[in-house]
């Protein structure tokens, strides 16, 4: 089977985007792992699948698969690339679209300067919504990792995040603690682990160890979760754009507080088009 794909990236978080509207696509986890291999396949952090919507009031359905073959609920950098893809490939002429995900509808909007802004929906904090094993919601939960007690803020942006504040992201134990947090027993569906350094009330540095992918150059939902966590902790300003510096570049995140959606703005870039035989 020959498969047409588009390689895209958002701040170095890279994707293979597949058009499931114009071609029928049914991939097994094993096939996705092969496609994700950077030596023998396409190579990507996530595979994004564009499909027709289930609800006629929406424009598309958006499915996300990590390079380990597992399907996940949400991907912020991928959402921007998704919006750029469907517009550039003539699947829509709208600059604002409604996109179904496994955890609700998101609304990406393309700007004339090439940036994409996405309404990522409101964050969730109840332990059952993460999911996270805890008696009740708290701004900071204690989590035992490698004999140490970490203070983490848990946030669902449609996918689960555990965010901790560190003094220096460059020396933070991302590769050592990341997989331990990801697979911690208190996160039944695993979790994305964020390491956030506060620069000012409107700027942070961030590294994220992503569930099923490892550390990536940037994580859009991780940036949203980090800003939300910082605001909940009283470290960042609400309803003000916060600059998130990742290893792949900058995102702008804005959240007005409880009950409001998180707005994410950043780039989405096409790298190349291709065709691969499975």
UniProtKB/Swiss-Prot annotation:
It is found in: Cytoplasm. The active site is at 75 (proton donor), 219 (proton acceptor). Substrate binds at residues 13, 46, 66, 76-77, 159, 192, 210-211, 220-221. InterPro entries: DAP_epimerase_AS, DAP_epimerase_DapF. Belongs to the diaminopimelate epimerase family. GO terms for biological process: lysine biosynthetic process via diaminopimelate. Homodimer. GO terms for cellular component: cytosol. SUPFAM superfamilies: Diaminopimelate epimerase-like. The record marks 161, 210 as: Could be important to modulate the pK values of the two catalytic cysteine residues. Keywords: Amino-acid biosynthesis, Cytoplasm, Isomerase, Lysine biosynthesis. Catalyzes the stereoinversion of LL-2,6-diaminopimelate (L,L-DAP) to meso-diaminopimelate (meso-DAP), a precursor of L-lysine and an essential component of the bacterial peptidoglycan. It catalyses: (2S,6S)-2,6-diaminopimelate = meso-2,6-diaminopimelate. HAMAP family: DAP_epimerase. Its EC number is 5.1.1.7. Its main location: cytoplasm. This is Diaminopimelate epimerase. Pathway: Amino-acid biosynthesis; L-lysine biosynthesis via DAP pathway; DL-2,6-diaminopimelate from LL-2,6-diaminopimelate: step 1/1. GO terms for molecular function: diaminopimelate epimerase activity.
